[in-house]
Amino acid sequence: MSDYKHTLNLPETDFPMRGMLPKREPGRVSQWQDMNLYQRLRDARAGREVFVLHDGPPYANGSIHIGHAVNKILKDIVVKSKSLAGYDAPYVPGWDCHGLPIEHKVETTHGKHLEADEARGLCREYAGAQIEGQKTDFVRLGVVGDWENPYRTMDFANEAGEIRALAKMVEGGYVFKGLKPVNWCFDCGSALAEAEVEYADKKSDAIDVAFAAAEPEALASAFGLASLDKPAAIVIWTTTPWTIPANQALNVHPDFTYALVDTGELLLVLAEELVESCLTRYGLEGDVVATAAGASLEFITFRHPFYERVAPVYLADYVTVEEGSTGIVHSAPSYGLDDFMTCREHGMSFDDMLNPVQGNGVYRDDLPLFGGQMIWKANPHIVDTLREVNALMAHTPITHSYMHCWRHKTPVIYRATAQWFVGMDREDDQGRTLRQRALDGVEATQFIPAWGKARLHSMIANRPDWCISRQRNWGVPIPFFMHKQTGEWHPRTVELMEDVARRVEAEGIDAWFRLDARELLGDEADQYDKVTDTLDVWFDSGTTHRHVMRGSHPMGHDQGPRADLYLEGSDQHRGWFHSSLLTGCAIDGHAPYKALLTHGFTVDEKGRKMSKSMGNVIAPQQVMDKLGADILRLWVASTDYSGEMAVSDEILKRTADVYRRIRNTSRFLLANLNGFAPERDAVAFEDMLALDQWVVDRAAQLQARIQGAYAEYRFRDVYQQVHDFCAHELGGFYLDVIKDRQYTTQADSRSRRSCQTALYHVVEALVRWVAPILSFTAEEIYEVIPGTRGDSVLLEEYYPHLATLEANAAMGREFWSRVLTVKQAVNKCLEDARNAKVVRNSLAAEVTLYADDSLRETLTQLGEELRFVLLTSEVHLASLEDAGSAQAEASELEGLKVAVVSSPHAKCERCWHHRADVGTHAADPNLCGRCLSNLPEGPGETRRYA
């Protein structure tokens, strides 16, 4: 038997079958850095329409987790897809650098007794080191951005910009002084920063207190009962009896289940999970008569145990069901931050908040029962009073870890004190409030997914004033001078703030803390107090639309500070989206963004949150080291980001399987471009074979859909379209059909060059489609495509050379759609024949298609070449009426029956078709006549269609 391998055009490529991504990707990152890809992109798109995705800054503390990876990959896909569409799409990554977590890290390492300026220096140093670590991982993910020039909220220019933004809001009349609970030391007589608080053991009275139902009918209804047959009460647990006189609400978790427990003489409301432990503590027995979700208890009122007032139930996410508690929290808003925020969110004004504890720890004299008593000494009196009114369910002295002043080693409480706020309902000079402007901003914003609009609208509509001050050391200062007698701002406050901003721009925030007031106020200095508060870190990031986009990193956007897109996790409706909206509306009168895209949180394959204790944490660093960043990127693109995003080792393994399909398809395309030079060998669309025209037309249609999907941030659709194209239209049809023509026709024949031209157009388009997602692999593919290449696929735009079929083409879209349907039906019949051992494979088969007139007319157009489409050695067409006398099977296609028989002819050793003329040619009895003509010295085969 002769070896005909050398006469075939077998596939050959340098593109490897195995990705070996963990090994190859770091080299690609280095290549991008060496070529300064980000700047090359800026230069290539200069003068084009600008698209700005403004980066919400992650906190500069700790290693990145899978949520960070999801966020940065989604942003990178957006930016790269916009660049692919021809936009100038800058991406400036940022970091949030101030705040308590970094202060704590520095204190843990260096101790709490640092001088303030030394502590700030160490915080700055720590944040810088954390940024470098996170940046390394983000770059390794394949995220392209201005990594050499990111924005950092601790950069002097941004710290100064923040002060200028605050000045604008002061000028607009939005900033005022109000109340908020802070750490308070009676011995210091002042508020304490978190850094000035330490924890030590303290003996306390743990008490369970019953609040009698004031609305038994409403309580019965909440539990699905017609009425209550005995008195009812809700039970709270606390270790601070001294706060009971200031109680104003009761908090339950909206998602917890609460039980109504019959103890004989009294019905008790307790968290269902804690019923058994609570009854044991009370020395009672009881039965659960009904249950209800916490949300159904909202606004039902209960009577204060010893004062003539009621406390409503509010919903609060911070409520827990830890052992020893009841699942209900008593709320004294002046003495707990969570209590304060919950009551403010439910509309309680500052004036309505009870604040009977004075700065020295003594109740005001006008407090009934306990006026004039020091709170620690009042505790046993309060316990006795609760016992006397039959409201004390349990009393247990405990020793627990509690806040103490680091100077005096004495207990500290939360106490409402004066803080700085941004007012939501103060009218500006146009008679509009910030709340109204912000709600208008919500309405003017596009939300992806759409449900985000209602969520943010509700938050803005119901939120309290924004407390922007913190008693922190590591933060941007609130540079106010307040008159000692009147409490009023200095009349030149805005002017003075600009002076401070210039100093901060040169020296950083230390410029304010070191400042002697006389430098700015002269002889007036003695009349004014210098404010030492710092700004909430949400104000830091919430004003980046101003001090980054219009300050440190101007992005050339035609609409100033209004970004095209903010993209963050769903928690940012309450966070960055929220603070940015408020500052944007206060400063510029509109939202700082046109659209908000929200993604869900990552969970495991069972929908559980990730935690080290459960062992279900997926670390992006480990995924990159084991599978490669492109697998992580493909998983992100393939997942519906609008909800929870499930990830696990098994899910990533399935993602890797899809990746291999795309990679192998690309490899087949490249391998069959062996010997093809597009400048020399490309065939004009009108001269291509009909099947090749069809696949180019399909690619053109697909590209239009992919462009639309990218434009609308439907990355999962892009993934599905590409995967389906590779798996079905290419892998399941076109690539199978063209193998015979590609391998067996003469190397330079029109038939082969037509096919190669189609493959070339398809791979040129495909590599661009996947580049925003599979950036590493796309570069690898791009480098191997024949023809003139640029330096990076990421510098390219959508492939412009995909021709389309005429609407009235004889072999147009409808024609090939019918042919494809026939092929699928015939494939099923061939599979049945193989299973029945009628034939070994499709090329060993001859088929007769009994088709109705319409179908037969379609198939007749392909003539002799129909067998190449069906991958059989022979095809006969007959009328459907003739099927009755033949052993034909009904196919899955109406109007078609198929008869499959084993070919009686010998197999050609070169093309493997079974043909009647094999053995009849003296020149080579092992070959069919077609293969003889396709040998290099032969005249060549002519194909017209397939």
From Swiss-Prot:
UniProt-annotated binding residues for L-isoleucyl-5'-AMP: E568
GO BP term (any one): isoleucyl-tRNA aminoacylation
Listed GO MF terms: aminoacyl-tRNA deacylase activity; ATP binding; isoleucine-tRNA ligase activity; tRNA binding; zinc ion binding
Pfam families for the chain: Anticodon_1, tRNA-synt_1, zf-FPG_IleRS
Described function: Catalyzes the attachment of isoleucine to tRNA(Ile). As IleRS can inadvertently accommodate and process structurally similar amino acids such as valine, to avoid such errors it has two additional distinct tRNA(Ile)-dependent editing activities. One activity is designated as 'pretransfer' editing and involves the hydrolysis of activated Val-AMP. The other activity is designated 'posttransfer' editing and involves deacylation of mischarged Val-tRNA(Ile).
Entry similarity comment: Belongs to the class-I aminoacyl-tRNA synthetase family. IleS type 1 subfamily.
Motif 'HIGH' region, chain ranges: 58-68
The record's note on its domains: IleRS has two distinct active sites: one for aminoacylation and one for editing. The misactivated valine is translocated from the active site to the editing site, which sterically excludes the correctly activated isoleucine. The single editing site contains two valyl binding pockets, one specific for each substrate (Val-AMP or Val-tRNA(Ile)).
Cofactors required: Zn(2+)
Motif ('KMSKS' region): 609-613
One GO CC annotation: cytosol
The record's free-text note on cofactor binding: Binds 1 zinc ion per subunit.
Keywords, sorted A to Z: Aminoacyl-tRNA synthetase, ATP-binding, Cytoplasm, Ligase, Metal-binding, Nucleotide-binding, Protein biosynthesis, Zinc
Coiled coil segments of this chain: none
Organism annotation: Chromohalobacter salexigens (strain ATCC BAA-138 / DSM 3043 / CIP 106854 / NCIMB 13768 / 1H11)
Subcellular locations according to the entry: Cytoplasm
Protein known as: Isoleucine--tRNA ligase
Superkingdom of the source species: Bacteria
tRNA processing found in the keyword field: no
Enzyme nomenclature, EC number: 6.1.1.5
